[in-house]
Amino acid sequence: MTVGKSSKMLQHIDYRMRCILQDGRIFIGTFKAFDKHMNLILCDCDEFRKIKPKNSKQAEREEKRVLGLVLLRGENLVSMTVEGPPPKDTGIARVPLAGAAGGPGIGRAAGRGIPAGVPMPQAPAGLAGPVRGVGGPSQQVMTPQGRGTVAAAAAAATASIAGAPTQYPPGRAGPPPPMGRGAPPPGMMGPPPGMRPPMGPPMGIPPGRGTPMGMPPPGMRPPPPGMRGPPPPGMRPPRP
């Protein structure tokens, strides 16, 4: 139900009210709520009822009962009167705690982090890592070496197959000279393409002086007197 602010019922909220019912009972309690049917809610309510004596000689006595929170039906309500003003403390009753007296301490909110004046704890020697940005490995050390090595080896193999000159790092000697029958000395022409070079000592190198001409090799007997020895290397024997 819509109730205006100027309603008399709203003006008596939290007052101590005396409610009289049709059967003569009286309810005294703190008025808290109501509705359009005049159903009431009373808290801290006490019930008072009059008991008639059996004999006419005895006086009528009144009985009191403590009920607490009560819901009264509006159809049984006869009248409502103000019993007293609202109590001073309408909140929840507080129970005093032992030792709750104020002390010398100061209440403050719990802070986050470490205060500025407290020194930072340090790790034991040997367990502390390098400072960020200082003492770490260089970029060259962290670069993977596998790719560069494989690429260099592949380039060297390709250059050797194609016949391109291989570049050697500074401080190292070049390739060793060719052994055996290599290129002819300067000023002389080599054999034409497709022909094998002639047998015998390399061109430009005199024959060995260890064995004179006409002497048999070591381990062979010389020919008997009057017979010619074998022809020198590179010459055909005479026809008979």
From Swiss-Prot:
PTM text: Methylated by PRMT5. Arg-108 and Arg-112 are dimethylated, probably to asymmetric dimethylarginine.
Gene Ontology cellular-component annotations: catalytic step 2 spliceosome; cytoplasm; cytosol; methylosome; nucleus; SMN-Sm protein complex; U1 snRNP; U2 snRNP
Modified residues (Dimethylated arginine): 108, 112
Sequence repeats: 175-181, 191-196, 216-221, 222-228, 230-236
Entry's localization field: Cytoplasm, Cytosol; Nucleus
Keywords from the UniProt entry: Cytoplasm, Methylation, mRNA processing, mRNA splicing, Nucleus, Repeat, Ribonucleoprotein, RNA-binding, Spliceosome
InterPro entries for the chain: LSM_dom_sf, Sm, Sm_dom_euk/arc, snRNP-assoc_SmB/SmN
Modified residues (Asymmetric dimethylarginine): 108, 112
Omega-N-methylarginine: residues carrying this PTM: 108, 112, 147, 172
Source taxon at top rank: Eukaryota
Region (Repeat-rich region): 175-236
Known function: Plays a role in pre-mRNA splicing as a core component of the spliceosomal U1, U2, U4 and U5 small nuclear ribonucleoproteins (snRNPs), the building blocks of the spliceosome. Component of both the pre-catalytic spliceosome B complex and activated spliceosome C complexes. As a component of the minor spliceosome, involved in the splicing of U12-type introns in pre-mRNAs. As part of the U7 snRNP it is involved in histone pre-mRNA 3'-end processing.
Similarity comment: family membership: Belongs to the snRNP SmB/SmN family.
PANTHER family: SNRPN UPSTREAM READING FRAME PROTEIN, SNURF (PTHR14508), SNRPN UPSTREAM READING FRAME PROTEIN-RELATED (PTHR14508:SF2)
Protein name: Small nuclear ribonucleoprotein-associated protein B'
